[in-house]
From Swiss-Prot:
<dbReference type="InterPro" id="IPR004821">
    <property type="entry name" value="Cyt_trans-like"/>
</dbReference>
<dbReference type="InterPro" id="IPR014729">
    <property type="entry name" value="Rossmann-like_a/b/a_fold"/>
</dbReference>
<keyword id="KW-0520">NAD</keyword>
<comment type="function">
    <text>Catalyzes the reversible adenylation of nicotinate mononucleotide (NaMN) to nicotinic acid adenine dinucleotide (NaAD).</text>
</comment>
<dbReference type="Pfam" id="PF01467">
    <property type="entry name" value="CTP_transf_like"/>
</dbReference>
<comment type="similarity">
    <text>Belongs to the NadD family.</text>
</comment>
<keyword id="KW-0547">Nucleotide-binding</keyword>
<dbReference type="GO" id="GO:0009435">
    <property type="term" value="P:NAD biosynthetic process"/>
</dbReference>
<keyword id="KW-0548">Nucleotidyltransferase</keyword>
<keyword id="KW-0662">Pyridine nucleotide biosynthesis</keyword>
<dbReference type="InterPro" id="IPR005248">
    <property type="entry name" value="NadD/NMNAT"/>
</dbReference>
<keyword id="KW-0067">ATP-binding</keyword>
<dbReference type="GO" id="GO:0004515">
    <property type="term" value="F:nicotinate-nucleotide adenylyltransferase activity"/>
</dbReference>
<comment type="pathway">
    <text>Cofactor biosynthesis; NAD(+) biosynthesis; deamido-NAD(+) from nicotinate D-ribonucleotide: step 1/1.</text>
</comment>
<dbReference type="GO" id="GO:0005524">
    <property type="term" value="F:ATP binding"/>
</dbReference>
<keyword id="KW-0808">Transferase</keyword>
<protein>
    <recommendedName>
        <fullName>Probable nicotinate-nucleotide adenylyltransferase</fullName>
        <ecNumber>2.7.7.18</ecNumber>
    </recommendedName>
</protein>
Amino acid sequence: MHVIYGGTFDPIHHGHLRLALEVSEALEVSRVHLVPSHIPPHRGSTGASSAQRLEMIRQAIAGEPALALDEQEVHRGGASYTADTLRQLRAELGPDCPLVMVVGTDAFSSFDRWREWQEIPGLAHIVVVRRPGSELPVGSEAAQLVAERCVGSASELHSRPAGLVLELAPPLLDISATGIRRRIAAGRSPRYLTPDDVCQSIRAWGLYGARPVEGQ
């Protein structure tokens, strides 16, 4: 089974990393692939370049065999759309390999506004991570999809290539990339919110309003 977890990762932090590991354990897979978007279609420009975000992810997952970096959206260029990414992966994996995309309830609540959203269940399973205080709108397309396709165990995702929904409620760290960027802009340290190597890169590159390290 091939599992992807997409996002801007601007910057990647311990909340992302812990969630990815929780998913790998819950789904009983050896690896979760982090897929940073190039230009997110539903957000403004990010604070770090695509190349910088890729490098920070490499630093963050170094030495962790359960996490891998998938650079396809960055290399493809342009706006990053989930349906395009899943089609590319389906072509690479073949028709029979179970493919899973991981998404939080906050992002999934607007599922019917995603480009070609109707095609996604035919390409992959969807794992919806329940976040505290974030519920799917009653009567929404997302809620209906969950009601129609939700299964009770991860083992069912292994039995077919696509089309099912699984809800997970793992313990989540209350860390956000937005909060980290604001903290840095205010002159506060992001240490212990994101890996030390990532903190060092943020300072070295002067990202998010950080004061660059002299001589770099």
